[in-house]
């Protein structure tokens, strides 16, 4: 058996995918998030909670406005890391550790214990339990079912989890031989409410979330309303429903009741159109200002029509975002391409682009953004991202030009470029997307690019998902 010790972002799904491939008795324990950070807000002069990552995006905007200088920027950034541990926001680190618990791969309540807390003694209980699991032959394949993955998707909505969860949950399911379709993502996500009042979707941080009841309290609320599969097996040897008995919310300011959520219909929206077959948008981070400015225009509610400003990677964005020749205004959408699994390679967290400084000074803190890469789980903006197929494999994003009009209709779940077919076909003949792909910098990158799938499919390596239960057969002797 194996104890999987996890922490930030990709460490959790990577460890779980390896365990699935080996199919040994496996249990997850993570190092825990940092304690809550505190700092004086430069805008109000009052003390406020400061969350890992999220404060970076907020401080960047304050820097652009001229409210703070670079020294203050660094001070704010450092104040968000007051102790050992991973990010204390509901970024990808905390999200994926919560997902591990939702999948039934941790002992109940272990996902979000702050790193310095004495309750980290849960590691001892985890060690005892793995020995029992070996004796019981409780392998990971007996825990992970399609229903447990649906539980993970639903829990991700309720906690306001990272958009990266779409990639990682899909990848873990692929390794387990389970297909999760685009329609199943929305069916198990969008209709559910946001319950966890944790940054970036909310106000508080993970220390307060843990003290309010953490993941078990959130899942208990979902289970009470028949939104989870309670009979799935977990590493405790008990069903999920048995594990959640008696788990209640202890602070309704931090974890809302199902009937009184922070937001309704808070899950990911799945989009498609003539630019891509698949993309997602995280609705729980749509701010009131963004909603009023872009989604509540009279007669066009839920519809955005905007002029595309196209960037070829983050370097191009940073070089040109302040260029007055681009004439960027609030009727624009910022587009990032070349950021997918093949194009980057590996897919970069660069789609959450902020507007030019002169717009931020006018009070426009975010513009619609779109791209074939990812964003940080700590980001407080709602881009349309994970576009598949990406531009580097000939996806239609490769043929988009600055000045094209993009129409996004959230009601119809569509995203289209308004360019006539004749013009579009001519571009496909004239533009070579291969010329924009940067050379691989290592043999590993070359191998990765040849075998990786798209973000819609979890960005898994095609050859890797062929292998199942590899510990059942010993390798040949080579001496």
Regions found by a protein language model. Name each.
Residues 1-15, 27-30:
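A short, small-residue-rich loop immediately preceding and capping a beta-strand
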Residues 12, 18-23, 31-390, 395-479:
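Catalytic or ion-coupling anion/metal-binding cores of large enzyme and transporter domains
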């Amino acid at each position: 058996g194996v104890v999987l010790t996890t922490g930030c972002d990709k460490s959790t799904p990577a460890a779980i995918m390896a365990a699935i491939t080996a199919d040994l008795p496996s249990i997850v324990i993570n190092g825990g998030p940092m304690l809550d950070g505190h700092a004086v807000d430069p805008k109000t002069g009052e003390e406020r909670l400061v969350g890992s990552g999220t404060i970076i995006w907020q401080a960047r905007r304050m820097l652009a406005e001229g409210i703070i200088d670079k020294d203050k920027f660094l001070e704010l950034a450092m104040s968000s890391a007051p102790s050992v541990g991973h990010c204390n926001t509901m970024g990808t680190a905390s999200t994926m550790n919560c997902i591990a618990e939702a999948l039934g791969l941790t002992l109940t309540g272990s996902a979000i214990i702050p790193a310095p807390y004495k309750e980290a003694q849960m590691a001892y209980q985890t060690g005892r339990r793995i020995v029992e699991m070996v004796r019981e032959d409780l392998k990971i394949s007996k825990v992970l079912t399609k229903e447990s993955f649906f539980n993970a998707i639903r829990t991700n909505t309720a906690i306001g989890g990272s958009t990266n969860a779409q990639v990682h949950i899909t990848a873990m399911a692929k390794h387990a031989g389970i297909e999760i379709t685009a329609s199943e993502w929305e069916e198990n996500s969008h209709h559910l409410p946001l319950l966890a009042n944790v940054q970036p979707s909310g106000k508080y941080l993970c220390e307060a979330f843990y003290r309010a009841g953490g993941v078990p309290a959130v899942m208990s609320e979902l289970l009470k309303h028949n939104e989870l599969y309670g009979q799935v097996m977990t590493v405790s040897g008990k069903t999920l429903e048995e594990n959640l008995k008696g788990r209640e919310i202890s602070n309704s300011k931090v974890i809302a009741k199902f009937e009184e959520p922070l937001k309704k219909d808070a899950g990911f929206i799945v989009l498609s159109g003539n630019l891509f077959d698949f993309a997602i948008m995280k609705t729980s981070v749509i701010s009131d200002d963004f909603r009023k400015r872009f989604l509540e225009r009279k007669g066009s509610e839920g519809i955005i029509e905007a002029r595309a400003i196209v960037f070829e990677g983050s370097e191009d964005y940073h070089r040109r975002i302040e260029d007055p020749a681009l004439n960027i205004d609030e009727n624009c959408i910022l587009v990032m391409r070349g950021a997918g699994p093949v194009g980057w390679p590996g897919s970069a967290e660069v789609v959450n682009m902020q507007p030019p400084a002169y717009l931020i000074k006018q009070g426009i803190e975010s513009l619609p953004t779109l791209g074939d890469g990812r964003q940080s789980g700590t980001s407080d903006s709602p881009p349309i991202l994970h576009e598949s197929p990406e531009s580097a494999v000939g996806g239609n994003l490769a043929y988009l030009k600055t000045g094209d009009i993009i129409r996004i209709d959230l009601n119809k779940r569509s995203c289209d470029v308004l360019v006539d077919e004749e013009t579009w076909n001519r571009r496909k003949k004239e533009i070579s997307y291969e010329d924009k792909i940067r050379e691989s910098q290592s043999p590993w990158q070359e191998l990765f690019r040849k075998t990786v799938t798209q973000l819609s499919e979890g960005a898994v390596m095609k050859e890797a998902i062929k292998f199942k239960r590899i510990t059942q057969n010993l390798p040949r002797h080579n001496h």
